[in-house]
Amino acid sequence: MFLRIRFALIIAICALLTACGGADRVGQANLVGQVNLAAAAPSVTTYYAASRLLEQASMGPSPSSVAQVRKYGIEAWIDAQQKLPPSVITTPANLLEFDDQNDRVLADLSWNTYRFNLQNIFLASEDQLRVRTSWVLSNFLVISTSKVKSYGGAEYMNLLQSNAFGNYSDLLKAISINPSMGTYLDNNQNNKWNLNENYGRELMQLFSVGLVQLNMDGSIKRDANGKALETYTQSDVIESTKALTGWNIATPNCGSTIKNCLNWANYGKPMVANEGAHNTDGKKLLGKTIPAGQTAVKDLESLIEILVTHPNTGPFVALRLIQGLTTSDPSPAYITRVATVFQNTKGDLKAVVKAVLMDSEARAGDVPGKSPAGFGRIKEPHLINTSLLRAMECPKAGTLTNTFNAWTQDPLNAKTVFNFYPPNHRAPSSKLLAPEQQMLTSEEFNMRLGRVSGAFWDPQARGLIEAGCNLDALSAAASASESEILNLISQRFFRGAMPAVTGQALLQSVNVNNNPLVKAGQMIDMALITPAFGVSK
């Protein structure tokens, strides 16, 4: 049954995101123009437009956030969001004290504390645009808590939050000497006598210049025979690695009360340079030279400067930010405009994120039916879950809101450095880029069904109470009439524009039951697997 549902949804998604374009950059026809900010934005922010923006720029619309966007307008809301201080996980000391894997009770306490605090940021933080940006960054600047544990995950999320609207050079420098990344990709204690190329390679391949040379529109440069031109060589990997040698996690000083002191105590601090282990030879990579005799800090700065100013990095980062915020298969013109902002501002992420969101292609769909052909993205499982909970006004982490054990995407815990899905994955039998589609499995659909109605079956509503959910409007609508509950579900989950056929499907999904909240929950369960909810278009 679930395989049939999955297949039907994929077909529907492909129909919603109709693609066209060439083999190298799939999307719409190349458009001519420079940065084009919100030329198509309506003068008054409608409910539909506000909800749509929040699907792109937050962890999901909530009634209060929709009202806020409508009050300030889209651009003013973005500007205000970018001025807010970062929300961070404020309990790393507890995580450190609890994270002793030899003690199962303390280990479980550590993981639960970490996950609840992380989920609180996703659900309830005021700086939702920053949080969404950090989420996107975490999906290509990858670590995994399976290796760095809960304390490392908390500190890495804090790092992303603190740098999400800063300069990309500063972000890469901070990541390069972050203990979580140093542990995950083996640059901690990397020395000139025994080079480990892991981080030096991934810093280029996944974090900056990529494997193949790109034009500004994201298309691949090719030689006369049509072969893709490689960005770097094995020699470049070695030279990059030499520039990164000599960094160690600082020696901890946390007293005798913390059992895992030696492993985790300084994960919240940058690694420190051991100049004796640093390679001071001159380095040549990507056509540039790093002078001999420099310190580990200076070599790192020189390396990052080479990578961030490389002509590939603008379109490389632009594509990943666009894919994570607005559309999986952006047009060449859209990529060009955002990449141009990246290059002109030398990697100012605040300006780049705003350019992604305010581009005319991103905002055209604020008028229903006006999205460019092929525009949109499939919501990944974690975003579906946070969108559900924010729509239901559930602001706190708890049994109900803890997605990590129940659903198929554990934030900051991808199985490999290549993330949960590759950015170049294409929908079946289509040229359409659809990375998140790879996570649409029968298991994932199965986990959506019954989640909300199951919570309402509990007569004590323990999960709902623990999560602080505000169910007043839902309860009133469910008790009033079918039309009232359909209208509320349309507002909360479909931007106020639920298709009529979807409404009929929701009504038909309800089992005979006298509890109006259970009925509402069954309808929401079904809403979660509809293409109209699962695709942000």
Predicted regions and their residues:
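Bacterial N-terminal signal peptides that target proteins for export
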Residues: 1-9
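Flexible, low-complexity segments enriched for small/polar residues
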Residues: 51-58, 310-345, 354-537
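N-terminal accessory alpha/beta regions
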Residues: 55, 61-163, 261-262
